[in-house]
UniProtKB/Swiss-Prot annotation:
GO terms for cellular component: cytoplasm; nucleus. It comes from Debaryomyces hansenii (strain ATCC 36239 / CBS 767 / BCRC 21394 / JCM 1990 / NBRC 0083 / IGC 2968). It comes from the Eukaryota. AMP binds at residues 132-136. HAMAP family: Aden_phosphoribosyltr. Keywords: Cytoplasm, Glycosyltransferase, Magnesium, Metal-binding, Nucleus, Purine salvage, Transferase. This is Adenine phosphoribosyltransferase. Its EC number is 2.4.2.7.
Length: 186
């Protein structure tokens, strides 16, 4: 892995982000990474940075969390020669599913994964846009374990460090862009 190349790619990607103070609620600095997808070269750089990080590590599946993990998860899976598996909100997937509940800031939610899509012992990456409290990522990890998959690592574009979400994860986590160390000060 070329850490220097990953750092250079991260700088270019960070420069394209838009910031929105106090969105979606007071005290939050929302960093919108959607502009990355309006420029094909930046989108390719995002995928390339994650691909460089993963390196030669064998990956069978990339699991993307609804909904922003769906934006780059399939493209990363393709670049890695892996399959893509979605984790969705409850009631959105057909057939037999595993379900895991997780806590959000204002209540709880449920994620699901189809039961027959990941083979026992398959190597899995879990991807999402932001690591915040760690609840949704941890829930996705629980689902992968229920399928018999082996989590290799969690990958995120950004992290809200002050929420300590990585403490809820039982496997290594990589964040491409340096995170927010503290809550927005007004």
């Amino acid at each position: 892995m070329s850490q220097v190349e990953i750092s250079e790619l991260a700088k270019e990607i960070r420069a394209s982000l838009k910031q929105f103070p106090n969105f979606p609620s007071e005290g939050i600095l929302f960093e919108d990474f959607l502009p990355v997808f309006t420029k094909p070269d930046l989108f390719q750089k995002l995928v390339r940075a994650f691909q460089l990080h993963v390196g030669e590590q064998k990956v069978d599946y990339v699991v993307g969390l609804e909904s922003r993990g769906f934006l780059f998860g399939p493209t990363l899976a393709l670049a890695l020669g892996a399959g893509f598996v979605p984790v969705r909100k409850a009631g959105k997937l057909p057939g037999p599913v595993f379900t895991a509940e997780f806590q959000k800031e204002y209540g709880s939610d449920k994620f699901q994964i189809q039961k027959d899509v990941i083979e026992e012992g398959a190597k899995v990456l879990i991807v999402d846009d932001i690591l915040a409290t760690g609840g949704s990522a941890s829930s996705a990890g629980e689902l992968v374990k229920q399928t018999g998959g082996d989590i290799v690592e969690y990958l995120f574009v950004m992290e809200l460090d002050f929420l300590n979400g990585r403490d809820k994860l039982d496997k290594p986590a990589f964040t491409l862009l340096s995170g927010q160390a503290e809550k927005l000060q007004n």
